[in-house]
């Protein structure tokens, strides 16, 4: 098991920046706003052949109510999961009462704790750090996370008792099925994640935009590995005023590309809006397998349910291959039925077929319904092979195949879907026109052959003149 290291501290001391330095990524949103990081965030990291998991937490704030109090509960959960705790303080701001309160709570846990003083750049370090000795946690490790200064030395100290990996490849194994939960703000994404996980893992708070980061959560179900990605709620670009929300949109789009399957959550009570369709469009551009979850289905009248179903059939007619589920994430109704559709979409997206079988299906399809003619000549499709997975990509070679019209492309897509029972994934078909490999090449002959050719030509011309007489 990889050891877990939790970054703990009050808001805006630089935990997310330190997280990025440790994991060598921009996984945690970084901006100069207190309370920006609202959930536990997991990241894999390796330093000097030592693999571990880093958990970035929301700051333990001084507010007693609302979301700040909920953030504190999330941080405490992360502390319980951790093997090692890095307690981050702000060298510029100095020792605050909230730092002392956190230190008192941490000392009661019996875990290995390292005190890290961040933002030591631009201050007299020795003078600034004296007061932190009052916390009784020994000498603070000095870092300037925004510049990466002191981070390597900190890791050497923190990881000194962690053994090196016996087999580094073991830590690079597949994370399992990566599942991204996407949707507009406040449609119930975090509630669905909590229901899927069976624990109160991400902040599910009645406030649009509560989840600002994409959170990667590894878990197992019935012996199968998953990584659940809870994405930030995506607003229309016109309504994105805060820099934080712009960051979150980027994170959502990145999470789509990182996922194997995307679950698009739609609010049944608000109906399908343009932003829902835009999100599906983004997922299609990323070529991701997809399952639609119509949430908040409970407590709707029979008339509203009927109208919702009609709206779904009408607005989602461009993705007839996507499974649609009517669920209530809050009460768990229909949530368990998502898994079979997710698995089917994943299997379809990772289709692998030999070129011989694909070519046979292509030949059967063209025999049954011939390709159209282009400039008086019929398109000739010769053979097909797989060009990739997720999405399944089929490459067709032949003469003038790049001129294939859209309706015949759809016909071929439907044939492949029917034969291999592909559900929940877009199918990409690429056409490559066969080229004459000798086109543009000049014949290269030796001098002897060239001389013989000239003699034959002269002899032919003499015979032709003699015949004309």
UniProtKB/Swiss-Prot annotation:
GO biological process, one term: ribosome biogenesis
GO MF, one annotated term: GTP binding
Record flagged with keyword Lipid metabolism: no
Keyword GTP-binding carried by entry: yes
Superkingdom as given in the UniProt entry: Bacteria
Keyword field: GTP-binding, Nucleotide-binding, Repeat, Ribosome biogenesis
Pfam families the record matches: KH_dom-like, MMR_HSR1
Domain EngA-type G: from-to ranges: 3-166, 177-350
Chain residues that bind GTP 2: 183-190, 230-234, 295-298
Domain KH-like stretches: 351-435
Family: Belongs to the TRAFAC class TrmE-Era-EngA-EngB-Septin-like GTPase superfamily. EngA (Der) GTPase family.
Function: GTPase that plays an essential role in the late steps of ribosome biogenesis.
Name of this protein: GTPase Der
Organism (species): Acinetobacter baumannii (strain ATCC 17978 / DSM 105126 / CIP 53.77 / LMG 1025 / NCDC KC755 / 5377)
Taxon lineage: Bacteria, Pseudomonadati, Pseudomonadota, Gammaproteobacteria, Moraxellales
């Amino acid at each position: 098991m990889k050891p877990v290291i939790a970054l703990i501290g009050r808001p805006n001391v630089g935990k997310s920046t330190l997280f990025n330095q440790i994991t060598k990524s921009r996984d945690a949103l970084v901006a100069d706003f207190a309370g920006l990081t609202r959930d536990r965030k997991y990241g894999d990291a390796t330093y000097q052949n030592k693999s571990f998991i880093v958990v970035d937490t929301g700051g333990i704030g001084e507010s007693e109510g609302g979301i700040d109090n909920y953030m504190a509960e999330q941080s405490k959960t992360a502390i319980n999961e951790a093997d090692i705790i890095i307690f981050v303080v702000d060298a510029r701001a100095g020792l605050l009462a909230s730092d002392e309160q956190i230190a008192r709570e941490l000392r009661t846990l019996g875990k290995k704790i390292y005190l890290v003083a961040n933002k030591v750049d631009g201050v007299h370090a020795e003078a600034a750090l004296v007061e932190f000795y009052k916390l009784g946690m020994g000498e603070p490790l000095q870092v300037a996370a925004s510049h990466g200064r002191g981070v390597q030395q900190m890791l050497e100290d923190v990881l000194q008792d962690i053994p090196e990996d016996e087999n580094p490849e073991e830590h690079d194994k597949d994370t399992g099925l990566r599942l991204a939960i996407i949707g507009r703000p406040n449609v119930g994404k975090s509630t669905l994640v909590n229901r899927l996980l069976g624990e109160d893992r991400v902040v599910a708070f009645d406030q649009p935009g509560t989840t600002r980061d994409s959170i990667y959560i590894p878990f197992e179900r019935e012996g199968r590995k998953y990584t659940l990605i809870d994405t930030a709620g995506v607003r229309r670009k016109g309504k994105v005023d805060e820099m934080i929300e712009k960051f979150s949109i980027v994170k959502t789009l990145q999470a789509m590309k990182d996922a194997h399957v995307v679950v698009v959550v739609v609010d049944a009570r608000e109906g399908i809006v343009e932003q829902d369709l835009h999100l599906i469009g983004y997922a299609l551009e990323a070529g991701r397998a997809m399952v639609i979850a119509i949430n908040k289905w409970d407590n709707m009248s029979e008339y509203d349910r009927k109208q919702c179903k009609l709206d779904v059939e009408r607005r989602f007619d461009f993705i007839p291959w996507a499974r649609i589920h009517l669920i209530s994430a809050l009460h768990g109704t229909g949530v368990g039925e998502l898994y079979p559709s997710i698995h089917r979409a994943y299997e379809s997206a990772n289709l692998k077929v030999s070129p011989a079988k694909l070519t046979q299906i292509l030949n059967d399809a063209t025999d049954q319904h011939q390709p159209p003619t282009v400039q008086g000549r019929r398109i000739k499709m010769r053979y097909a092979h797989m060009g990739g997975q997720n999405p399944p990509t089929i490459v067709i070679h032949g003469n003038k195949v790049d001129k294939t019209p859209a309706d015949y492309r759809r016909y071929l897509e439907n044939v492949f879907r029917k034969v291999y029972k592909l559900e929940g994934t877009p199918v990409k078909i690429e056409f490559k026109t066969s080229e004459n490999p000798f086109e543009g090449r000049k014949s290269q002959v030796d001098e002897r052959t060239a001389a013989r050719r000239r003699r034959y030509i002269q002899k032919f011309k003499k015979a032709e003149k003699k015949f004309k007489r």
